[in-house]
Amino acid sequence: MPELLKQRVETCYQQAETFFKRPFPRPEVSFKLRGQKAGVAHLHENLLRFNLQLYRENQEDFLRQTVAHEVAHLVAHQLFGDRIQAHGEEWQLIMRGVYELPPNRCHNYEVQRRVATRYIYRCPCPQGEFAFTAQRHKLVRQGRRYLCKRCRETLVYSGETRVE
């Protein structure tokens, strides 16, 4: 686990403890997050998940803003309970008052779109070409059948793929 991120989580907790004059339990930290989200706070599990790729590509802002953003969710939940809005006034108070950061809801990191392979299936219809995802293609290989809505014939794998 990146040590700087771990240290930043700890620093955020120390700032919150100084500000609120009370201790907070430390969360488990995971890097099992992919896609567009930079971070997620699981309130009831006391768990923070971070996107390692976005961290590596945006380290400075990620450490300053994203880590504080997610820690603020856990601190707000531990202080105010379940009945608060995710980015409501309690969370904003923590972002502004404790961390002296703008309470931004979303990041503006550039997210690389994943390359996806499509498997081409056909039927006898004109323009009867269908691009299946890897998951749907696997289901066909396991015996599932898909029918064309126009001609009601079974779609057949053409042996072709394309990358999108």
From Swiss-Prot:
Residues forming the catalytic site: 70
An example Gene Ontology biological process: response to stress
Record-level Gene Ontology MF annotations: zinc ion binding
Cellular location(s): Cytoplasm
Transmembrane stretches, start-end: none
Keywords linked to the UniProt accession: Cytoplasm, Metal-binding, Zinc
Main location: cytoplasm
Full protein name: Protein SprT
